[in-house]
Amino acid sequence: MHRVAQAIVEEKTRVIDVDLRSYFDNVQHALLLKKVGRRVQDTAVMHLLKMILKATGKKGVPQGGVVSPLLSNVYLTEVDRMLERAITTTRRGKYTHVQYARFADDLVILIDSHPRQDWLVKAVEKRLREELAKLGVEINEEKSRMVDLTKGDSFSFLGFEYRRILSRNKVWRPQYVPRLKKRTALLAKLREIFRRYVSQPVERVIELINPILRGWVNYFAVGHSSRCFSFVKDWVDKKIRRHLMRARQRSGFGWNRWSRQWLYEKLGLFNQYQLLRREPPSKAQPTGSVS
């Protein structure tokens, strides 16, 4: 995430938001095994890997498996190398005109906004298609798009929604928050637990929802998630209060009956919604400049 944020600070505001068509279903086993075999010499490990892949036929990586993210990353290493070369060959001193970030099939490429780099957008896109074609992977034309952050557009990467905002100091800064669909999915999962365990003691409900909340918050704590966290916290608070009141066959939320402190300290409801603070990215200084 920091790599993307840094690129936005450096005015790489033209973003190729890449969506790969049915990526996990189209990983070619022969190519994948060849790539893994260059690094793994253990025959037992290679045999186990073949057995795992065999379950999906002649191509595809089983989603949800322990090794699936690793295999999905390994398969696109040539794409990484191509983009790293693009960064190196277009570098001018300390400043780069291209940056990218990828995890498995989630890929974004950020390019300098200056008109002199218009050619670079087409060149990178062309080379990307060439490398993907060698791997039997296609770009989903309907979902892939070119984003211009200077026009207020946004793009998503690894569950975060990125955009560029003007700070109080009149400096353009990146902002990345949890995507709305991620928050919606979280609340749907929690709502199902409240529904399924409506007649169970509140302690049992909290025992089930706390690990879900902890994992979700820990993941999104690196972003500008305070407003989203406040929404989730209030939503869970109300759900717990309704559960308690329903058990007493009463309406309302029991605002005067139970304090928030009681919910967190007495019942043990998850309450660690703190953000992980880190130094904001700064613009790279070109070679020879005075810092």
Which residue ranges define each predicted feature?
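Amphipathic alpha-helical core segments of compact helical bundles
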Residues: 54, 72, 76-80, 84, ...
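A glycine-rich phosphate-binding loop feature that marks nucleotide/adenosyl-phosphate handling sites
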Residues: 100-103, 142-152, 209-212, 229-237, ...
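Conserved polymerase palm-domain catalytic core
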Residues: 2-149, 154
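Alpha-helix N-cap/helix-start motif at coil-to-helix transitions, marked by capping-box chemistry
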Residues: 43, 47, 74-77, 180-184, ...
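A conserved non-catalytic segment of reverse transcriptases
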Residues: 135-201, 212-214
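Extended C-terminal regions of large enzymes
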Residues: 235-239, 244-291
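Short, solvent-exposed helix-loop connector elements
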Residues: 59-63, 191-205, 216-228, 245-249
